[in-house]
């Protein structure tokens, strides 16, 4: 059985992953190497978004446990109208903002708060 590759570690305690499809295909996203932060593997994201591809155009995406932002940025890359990312770790939220700026992600909102509190 093959084992999923873990994202490569890069400088400054950051790791990277790639966006699989859409307008940002093959672009790299950086995220902090934090305990418990495990991005959704490429193969899982590819399968999920292949299923959802006809449903994404114009939808508003809410990612409650954003982490690396992989799921949300993938959705925005593939045609979602807007994206709201909630990440309770303030350092990772800053990293998500940097990635959104790098991608010129219009319609992306990043909130640094606990999703359970935000949902109340």
Q: What feature does the model see in each segment?
A:
Residues 1-120:
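Class I S-adenosyl-L-methionine-dependent methyltransferase catalytic core
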């Amino acid at each position: 059985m093959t084992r999923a590759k873990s994202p490569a570690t890069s400088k400054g305690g950051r790791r990277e992953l790639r966006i699989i499809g859409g307008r940002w295909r093959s672009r790299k996203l950086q995220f902090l190497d934090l305990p418990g932060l495990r991005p959704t593997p490429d193969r899982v994201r590819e399968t999920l978004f292949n299923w959802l591809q006809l449903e994404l155009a114009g939808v508003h995406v809410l990612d409650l446990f954003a982490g690396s932002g992989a799921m949300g940025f993938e959705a925005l890359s593939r045609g979602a109208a807007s994206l709201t990312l909630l990440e309770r770790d303030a350092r990772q939220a800053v990293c998500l903002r940097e990635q959104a700026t790098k991608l010129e992600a219009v319609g992306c909102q990043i909130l640094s708060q606990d999703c359970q509190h935000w949902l109340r």
